[in-house]
Structure formats: C-alpha cells, structure tokens
Amino acid sequence: MKTGQTVMTRGIADKVADNEKFAKQVTYFMGLYFSGDWGSVSEDDKEMNDINVQMGIGSLMGAYETCEGRIWIMTEHDRSVTTILFPSEY
C-alpha cells in the first residue's frame, strides 16, 4: 500500500520526545496502520479504507487509543503523505 512520506504534527512530536511509552505506542500503531489495521474507526470507515487500498485511490484513516489520548493516522487521497496527529490538531 502506497502511503507516501510519514510526518507527525508538532503536538505528536513533542509528546514522543517527552514520553517513551507514547513513542512506543505511536510506532506500534504505525505498524498496524501500514498493515491495514485501522484501529477504532467505524465499520463503514474500515470498509472504505479497505476498498481504497484495493483500488489504490482515496484517503485512508486510522484511530488509536494511547496513553496520551486518541491519535489519528491519515493518508492523503493522492498517497503523497501520511500524517500522525491528535484529533484536536485536525
């Protein structure tokens, strides 16, 4: 699955730098995301992600619960970049 460059927001980067447990969780959830495990998104969103992966088009989104709260991992529709962020940063 093409996901482009992976980046994180300042909020995620700051927490990763300060919290080793959170950093490990982010790394773990990135692995899940890149293997097609979308975390705690709705069944409809999971199905849409799976279709978009098969077709090679459309955006992708995963949601995961961490020790610092929920994070989102989102891939742009053109698959140029994948961003890790807190929902409040959207």
Residue ranges and their predicted role:
Residues M1-M61:
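Compact soluble domain cores
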Residues Q54-Y90:
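Short, compact, well-ordered microdomains
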